Amino acid sequence: MFIKIPGCVLLLSLWPLANQAQPVPAVAPATSPGKTKTAVSTPADLPATARPASPRQLFPGLFEAVQLGRVFPDNKTFVDAAPRQRPAAILAAWRREKARPGFQLRAFVERHFDLPADSAVAFRSNVAAGLRPHLDTLWTVLARPAAPAADPADSLAAFRSLLPLPRPYIVPGGRFREVYYWDSYFTMLGLIEANKVQLARDLTDNFAYLITRYGFVPNGNRSYYLTRSQPPFFAGMVQLLAQRQGNAELLRYRPALEREYRYWMQGAAQLKLGTAAHRAVRLPSGAVLNRYWDDSDQPREESYAEDVAAAKQSRQPPAQFYRHVRAAAASGWDFSSRWFGPAAAGSKSPDGGLPAIQTTDLVPVDLNCLLYQLELTLAEASRVADSPAQANAYAAKAQQRRAALLALSWDPKAGWFQDYNWRLKQRSSVRTLAGVFPLSYGLASPAQAARVAAGLKTSFLKPGGLVTTLRKTGQQWDAPNGWAPLQYLAIEGLNRYQQRPLADTVARRWLALNRRVFTQTGKLLEKYDVVNPNRPAGGGEYPLQDGFGWTNGVLLRLLNQYERQ
């Protein structure tokens, strides 16, 4: 399973959001990288009780009864429901009624909660109109309005899981009724192509608001997501706006970029060699890289029954298992064989599956490429702000990260960039499309990029595009599935290193697959089977979703790049 290898708080000033709907707490300024810092308490640093309460915290007992009793096929239904009364009143009614003959839990929930509506039910695709008109229509279908500050007279506002945002936003679609962090970068690609720059700015402003309010960007704008983030694409969003609007965007979002960097590096300065805390890992060399992490070690509220059942199949202590599962959710790759440890002795399986998940033990190559981009973006923003010392400090941190990541993740025998197990001091043998990120973000050498391109062509390239991994496990982030964001980043990386014929092949195969499925079904999907394009994609903890934000964004970007009309 593994191949052996030889052995700060930053400046924060609040920037104004025009017509901002919600107040933002003031935060003391802090020092530049490398200097002694003064601790500043933020919501991300405070105990969970200081954050908005989640459904499990609000409805103890009832929550477990509903989720473990599978009252709804999807556990996400209940956590997205809005209570019609205060929690104390609902809990009192449940305790009175639950022992009565004929009590029906679903009927009780439907009386006391407003269940989430499927907003896409009324939408019907017009296949005859074509793909581009469909994409234009979907921006409206998937758009959600800004939520103003809670009305003081609304006594139930604090008990809903949805976190208000000051700007309009785009949801992915299907069961995903809220904004998602890394999805939104790829959605923004399409918004900018569609000349909806203001909506792209709205998304970026919403994430800056979340960073200011909570100290980081949560997985999504739900109270039950406030224990973890997702792949940090905020710097990429700012760069998209800067490319379109100029360097003033770097200054506008600089405080939020610095605040997010602080979140990812929390505790790094105090780490001893070979240890980790939160999202930071200090290697034996002294270099610091990062991992995915969740502050909770309990079952995910939105997948509670699934997590409880899966923990019973694992030999790990439940808290450890749940932490790994949640960290995988933070990665966006939930779930994939890239996170799984070795199989038990005597097993014919190449890995131990979900019971052997070990996400927090791994230093992911893709995460550290994104943080490299964040450091370079901060260096650039500091130069624009005429702060050369800060610019040099961030640039140095980026180069230190690059050197450490390349040393640990590059497998010269496989010709691939792979995750690194910091506990075992071993590189993973699992090849995944995360290995294209060093090309996408310019960390790879030309020779390394050429070898990755060769590996993509011989192993990952399928009739519908690039397969996510080379293992077929039944997990949705494994073979035979392909995902829009990974296709796009692979294409970008190949073009960056002059591997244009392969980039063109990947793009055209992905476009053809998207078009074929749309013509047959009238839908654009969350993921696709790229091995057998005539078969729907599978895996995951929920049915295949349509919509779909990041698919739409990548599709429009590639249509304009390869089939501009």
Predicted regions and their residues:
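Bacterial N-terminal signal peptides
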Residues: P6-P16
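Boundary at the C-terminal end of the N-terminal hydrophobic targeting segment
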Residues: N19-P23
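Extended glycan-interaction surfaces of carbohydrate-active proteins
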Residues: S54-L58, L62-E178, D202-V217, N221, ...
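Alpha-helical support elements that line or immediately flank enzyme active sites
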Residues: Y180-F207, A434-S445, Q487-R500
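Short glycine/serine- and small hydrophobic-enriched flexible loop segments
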Residues: L189-E193, G236-Q243, Q373-V384, S440, ...
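Extended, well-ordered alpha-helical scaffold segments
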Residues: K196-F207, A248-M265, L374, D386-L405, ...
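Aromatic/His-enriched, Gly/Pro-containing loop or helix-boundary segments
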Residues: I211-Y253, Q545
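Long, repeat-rich segments with strong aromatic
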Residues: I357-S387, Y394, Q476-L489, G493-P501
